[in-house]
């Protein structure tokens, strides 16, 4: 996977001028004052007319007191282009004063030239600022802002970009200017800064400052600014994409996007790069190593359980439903694992089997083939959340939480992993998700060496390298090493991934197909059915469709097909029939069912026998109960087959995307 390199080239004359301007001004200022002070002291010290503090009016002092502050005052006057000297017979000039006057003149020329050039530059840009519209505003020039800038440059839209950055020392400001973007130095939470960026006339705003609180303040200020616009002043709502760094906060905030502001003239979408990176890995990079036979089981090892590790665990549990049709195994390790695992289990109590008995045991004590089966229902859960029903699926996966040794090359830890990997049908995959790129790289390399010594040289190791494209490119070139980078901004924070995500498009198609089936069923009964629009569906159900869309990519890989963005208008995809062999169709339906079960469990849903009336079923849904959270054979499988039957049909309707035969077809 080639990485994108940014070449930051500044013209030599500009580089020298900008770096030396401050030095020149400082040097001339010092020279003016020092030589001027010395010259005036020399001038008055060499004459009999030394300034004094003797009183006026004829009062006589035997010995007048010499006032040496006068030379200081005269030296300061040089900065105002006032020579301050009395060049006559009584006060002869000297070479020190000549140097000081020359330095003062040069200082005036340098400073005034810089000011005039800045004013001329502002005047030059003023017509463009006053007429700018339908442009893109990027608040924050960090990793995400840079990626957006690069993507817009590739689309030929970079001159329609305005960067708002509050740090004048940001090393990428010159890069942005060289690309042709407009750069504003200012606080994006302030109304005057947003006014200068003309956000009221913009097409899109990306709020990527790197601080969740600041980003929300920007959204609120945008709402205030657009609230009182007349309909004639804006034809379409301003599209605002706000990055929320905290994955859990982003999930909680997403349903409230419509109430983050009071303006009908803007729409807000929340995105999270960590979630994007984890989903990208599971749906695009994991398939070659995934379990594909029913005799196989995935054993995922997550090293580092911070924000990225937790996002990875959630995505693997939600959409890691493969053709093996088994629960996934997890070994999750970090320093002081209880500190991060306990809040995670509190948020996702049905992620795995566990007990809150103060024993210190988190997750499962061991792995067994019986517990890999979805019908296994004997592992414990806290009594308060356990469902007392033999048909219920209680939790999504089997996970153990262990301490990560301080030493990265701990042989005992590698030996323990190797022992777990050597069982029949085990498909181990390691994810290194620490907080620092360099530490992740070192841990991945050292663990690879340790596992090789334990006879597990073929274990793939995915390493999170979001900030070091050079390291990621190095690993990409060494594909035989089975150390694979992920999480780079050119995929997780790409412009199209944020503004037009595939999961949103497929999710809408899934919902439309569902509404079509419901309308047909109602018509057969002689009833009317009011179809719901995508925007009117509760966010929880919209997100469920999005997760189903994520998994659609894995189902397509199961039948040897992949969906990709169309890069040119002439690019053609294959045409695929919607008919599957019955055994393939059943496998895909089972994959969808257990994917749906895991997603529902993580969202807090529980099993309950089917309601006997519409009112009871509606009440169960409100309380997050569902009778289908059970094994495939005991569920209403029609819903799963319905979704499978529209895979090709719906995916081939997507504008801007094509289906094609995957390179690793079965």
Give, region by region, the residue ranges found by the protein language model:
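Amphipathic alpha-helical binding modules
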Residues: 618-656
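C-terminal accessory/binding modules appended to enzymatic or scaffolding proteins
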Residues: 586-622
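Surface-exposed intrinsically disordered loops and tails
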Residues: 375-383, 608-634
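Cytosolic regulatory regions of ion transport systems
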Residues: 1-32, 36-73, 77, 81-590, ...
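Short, charge- and proline-biased low-complexity linear segments
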Residues: 537, 548-557, 611-619, 646-650
